[in-house]
Amino acid sequence: MRISWMIGGAQGSGVDTSANIFGNAVAASGYYIYGNREYYSNIKGRHSYFNLTISDKPPRSIAQQIEILTSFDAETIFQHFNEVKDVLIYSTEVENTKAEQVQSMEPEITEHVVKFLKEKGYGTTVKDVINYLKKEKGVKVIPIDYMEILKKVADQAKVQLSVADRARNTIAIAASYKLLGLKEQYLINSITRTFRQEVFAKINTIAAQLAMQQIQPMYNLPELPNNEEKINLDGNTAAAIGKIYGGLRFQSYYPITPASDESVFIEAHQTVFTVDPKTGEKRKSTIVVVQAEDELAAINMASGAALTGVRAATATSGPGFSLMVEGMGWAGMNEVPVVITYYIRGGPSTGQPTRTSQADLMFALNAGHGEFPRIVIASGDHVEAFHDGTWALNLAQKYQTPVIHLVDKALANSYSIIPKKTLGMENIRIEKGKIVINTNTPELKRFEITEDGISPFAPLGTARVHYTGDEHDEYGFIAEASENREKMYEKRIKKLMTADKEIPEESRVNVYGNTDSKVAIITWGSPKGAILDAMEELENEGIKPMLIQIRMFSPFPKNLMRKLLNGKEFIIDVESNYFGQAGEVLKLNTGIEPTHYILKWNGRPMMRDEVKEGIKAVVQKGERRVVLHGGA
C-alpha cells in the first residue's frame, strides 16, 4: 500500500512544519514515511511544496503522480493540478484567481498553464482548473472555506483573526489527514508537540478539529502495530549523527545551502558522552564547531584540528568546495586525515542553491592541481548517510588522506520515518590507524616511507613534526631532489593502492535484484530509492533488472564491477546530470561503457513513476537516452 500526498504554499508560510506534523501523525498510526521538500532560493513568498509517501513498509522515494494534493494558495493548484490522481483540497478564497494574476509564478510556468487550459477549452481561473480535474480526470474536489474556519478559531480561542490566521496550513493538513481515516488524536498530539507556546497549540488544535469535522474518510487506512521505536531522519541530520557517533571533535563550516543544516545540528549537540570500554566510566566531551570567515578558512581549520589528532571535518556545497580546493591540496600534500562532506546542488556558479544535482562527481574526484590520493564515498539513503559519517572519519584516519563524502541535495533535504533499529548504531566501530602518542623521539619521520605508504602519525605537541605545502622529505623539510620527489610522490599514491587492497570491493558496491538479469542498472546517491521502488513495480510487468549502486568512487571497485556487468545486454546509467558521469568513471576504470542512459538535470529529485517509465522506454522501446522532466 502506498499513498502519495503533497502540500504546497508560499515560502515561509509553514509548509515544512505542516508536512512534519502530518507525517508524524501518520507514523504514530504505524505507517512509514518518505518525504521531500522543494523550495525556491528566497526567504519568503515563492512556491514551496512537500511531497510525501505513506506506506505500510518503509518507502524509499516520492512519486510525481500523487493521490492527495492539499493547498492553501492558488499557485500550488496551478503548479501541480496535472499531478493529482484522487483528491484536491483547496480554499474557496482562491476560486476566482487567474493564473495570470499569480505574480510569484515564473512567466514560463504561467504561459504553460494558460496554454494548456485554453487548449483543453477551459478558462484560466482556479475554478476552471477544478472543472477540468472533475470532468477530465475524475478527481474528487473538496472546497473548504478557510476564512469561515479561521473566524471560528479566533472566536473559540479568544484571539484576533490575524493570530488565528497562523493556523491556516493546519486546516489543510487536518482535512487531508481525515481522508486517511486514521485516529484524530494522533494529529492533535503531533500539533501539541510541535507548538510549545500555549496560544499556538490552542489555535492549531481548534483549527484541526474544525477542519476534520467537514471531511468524510475516503481511504479508511487501518491502524497498524506500532511497537517499535522509530526515528525521523533527513540527510543532513543523518550525516551529522554519523559523524558524532564516529567520534567527531571538530567541525568547521561557512554557511551555504544545503550544507549548513548539518553543522547547525552538530552545534546544537556539541556535548557528547562516551563510555570507556575497559572501565565502563562515562566521560563528557565536547565537539568544537566553528563558523569560519570563508570556505578556505574552514578547510584549513579542519586540517589544523586533524593534525592535533582529533577527528575533524567540514561541510560545504559546490561553490564552497571550489574555494576549498587549494586547502584540500595542502591536506593532500601533508597527508591530513580530514573529512569534507560535500552536499551537491545545482551549478555552475551560484546555480540553483536549493535544487538537487549529481553534476559534481568528476569535480570531487579530480579537484586540485597535481596528483594526490583522496577517498570518495557516496550515500544513497539516510541509513547510509549515517554510517558514512563514521566511515569517512575512519577512512581518513586509517589512510591519512582527505575523504570526500558526497550527499546530493535530494538526499540532504528529504526525510524518512524508519525503525530506529535499521540504523544499526550498535555496529559502529572506530578505526584510528597508525597514531603514535609516545614517540620516544624528539623528531619524528612524519612522512616515513613505508611498505603500505602510511606513515606513523604523531599529533601536534607530542613530537617535533614539520608541515609545508612544498614537496618535502620524510621529516617534512622542503626537498626538491628528483629522487626524493619520486619516492614521496609514489609513497602518497601508494596509500590509495593500499586502500584498494584492504577495503573489500563488496563494501564499495550494493547489489539489488536479479543478478542473472540481462538488464543491469548502475547508479549512485539519491536515485537509488526511486529505482528500487520502480523495480518492485516493474517485477509485476515481467521486467526484473539488477541494480548496482556505487558506494565508493575512489578507489573504484573495478574488479567487482567487471564481474557484475559481464554479459549484460542492457547497462543503464541512471543519475542526475547531463553527461552520465558515473558511466564515465565506470568506463575509465573498467573499459565498460553504459549502453543506455536515464538522466535528469532539472534540479528536482528522481521519482519512482518517472524512473519506471524510463526503464520501460529503454528495455521495451530501445531508447538509448531518456531524459526525465518531473517536478515543479
Swiss-Prot record:
Enzyme class label: oxidoreductase
Temperature dependence: Optimum temperature is 70 degrees Celsius.
Record-level Gene Ontology MF annotations: 2-oxobutyrate synthase activity; 2-oxoglutarate synthase activity; pyruvate synthase activity
pH note: Optimum pH is between 7-8.
InterPro entries xref list: 2-oxoacid/accept_OxRdtase_asu, 2-oxoacid_Fdx_oxidoreductase, PFOR_II, Pyruvate:ferred/Flavod_OxRd, Pyrv/ketoisovalerate_OxRed_cat, Pyrv_Fd/Flavodoxin_OxRdtase_N, Pyrv_flavodox_OxRed_cen, THDP-binding
Keyword Transferase: no
Binding site for substrate: 257, 345
EC number, UniProt record: 1.2.7.11
GO BP field: response to oxidative stress
Entry-linked Pfam families: PFOR_II, POR, POR_N
SUPFAM superfamilies membership: Pyruvate-ferredoxin oxidoreductase, PFOR, domain III, Thiamin diphosphate-binding fold (THDP-binding), TK C-terminal domain-like
Keyword field: Oxidoreductase, Pyruvate
Catalytic activity: a 2-oxocarboxylate + 2 oxidized [2Fe-2S]-[ferredoxin] + CoA = an acyl-CoA + 2 reduced [2Fe-2S]-[ferredoxin] + CO2 + H(+)
Superkingdom of the source species: Archaea
Entry text on domains: The Tyr-Pro-Ile-Thr-Pro (YPITP) motif is important for the turnover of the reaction, presumably through its flexibility and mobility.
Function as written in the Swiss-Prot or TrEMBL entry: Catalyzes the coenzyme A-dependent oxidative decarboxylation of different 2-oxoacids such as 2-oxoglutarate, pyruvate and 2-oxobutyrate to form their CoA derivatives.
Subunit record text: Heterodimer composed of an alpha and a beta subunit.
NCBIfam families registered for this protein in UniProt: OAFO_sf, Oxoac_fdxalpha_Archa
The protein, known as: 2-oxoacid:ferredoxin oxidoreductase subunit alpha
Organism this protein belongs to: Saccharolobus solfataricus
